[in-house]
Structure formats: C-alpha cells, structure tokens
Amino acid sequence: MKNLFLFLLISALALTAEAQNPSELGAEYMMPIGKGYKSNIAGLRYESFNNKTSFSIGITYHFSPNDAYGGFKGYGLYAGFRNSFGSNTSGSNPFIGLRLLFAFENFEGKTNLGSLMFTPIGEVGWHFLFGDHFFTTPSVGYGYQIKVTKEHNTRDQDEGGRIIPGLSAGYRF
C-alpha cells in the first residue's frame, strides 16, 4: 500500500510539473538553398518549453525539387534548442536557436549513393500563438552541410553552406 501511495504521489507531482510547461506538436517545412543546391524538407516536430527556453526533436523527409540538377530523397532527424527574447505571456516572441540535423540522403542516377549528412544550423524567427492552442513559427537559418560518408554527388553540391527558410505550424498542449 505504501508503494502504491508513493507511486501515485510521484505521478501526480510529475504530471503537475509537466502541465506547467507547455509542449507543441506540429508539421514543419524547410527549403535549404545553397550554391548549386536546392532541397525540400518536410517533417513532424515536437517542442517542449521551460520558461524562456525550449527543446525540440523532429523527424524529416528530404526530397529534391523538380528543377534540381540531381534527384535525391531520404530521411533524417534533428534535435534543437531555442531561447526566447521576449517575456510575452501570450507566447508570441522572437527567438534564436541552434539545431543539429542528421540526414540520410539517397542520390539517384546511374547508381544509388547513400549519403549520411550532418548539418549544424543557427536560426532566428518569431513564434506566434493564436488563441490558446495554435501556433506558427516562421524562421530563417544558416547551416553548413557536412557529408560524413566518402561518396560524393556528381557535382559536389551535397556539401556547403545553406540559407534555410522554414515554417512550422501545429497545436500547443
């Protein structure tokens, strides 16, 4: 009985603490642009807030636009950190953040070359909260894509600096 009471007490305290820190679930679209390089990234994201900071994780799908030189597609995941500049209680504030994106892109052509990519990204943006539960977050970032595997795409366009505009939207709990 004592263990059950202790379990219920700890569970109640943990749920109460989590209820004080909002979290968000939504979709995200990013469009990395670099010298000779264009890409599309769509994905799902989860973000948890603690006062003026937030931590996010996401799963992404990478695909090349129709007008790109070489075709590719692949999956990735990321983890990120954001810090808010404002203290607006409505949740609409500017932010600055860092994100680490790991992606496995499969380049198409005569042979399929699987490429593991690592991209550190710095971003700035604005987090808008509509009503109590809906959000949208436009942002722009700069990242440098680093290829971990040795194979290269035919024009070496898979490495280098990227300007990364993005937009996410979803539901706040």
Language-model regions, residue ranges each:
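Extracytoplasmic loops and strand-loop junctions of Gram-negative outer membrane beta-barrel proteins
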Residues: 26-29, 106-108, 150-152
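Short, surface-exposed coil-to-beta transition loops
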Residues: 38-41, 119-121, 164
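A short acidic/glycine-rich loop-to-helix N-cap element
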Residues: 147-158
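Outer-membrane beta-barrel "beta-signal"
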Residues: 78, 160-173
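Internal, hydrophobic beta-strand segments that form the core of beta-sheet-rich folds
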Residues: 139-142
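Short glycine/proline- and aromatic-enriched beta-strand/turn motifs that initiate or cap beta-hairpins
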Residues: 19-68, 168-173
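Gram-negative (and chloroplast) outer-membrane scaffold detector with strong preference
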Residues: 45-136
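Cleavable N-terminal export/targeting peptides
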Residues: 1-22
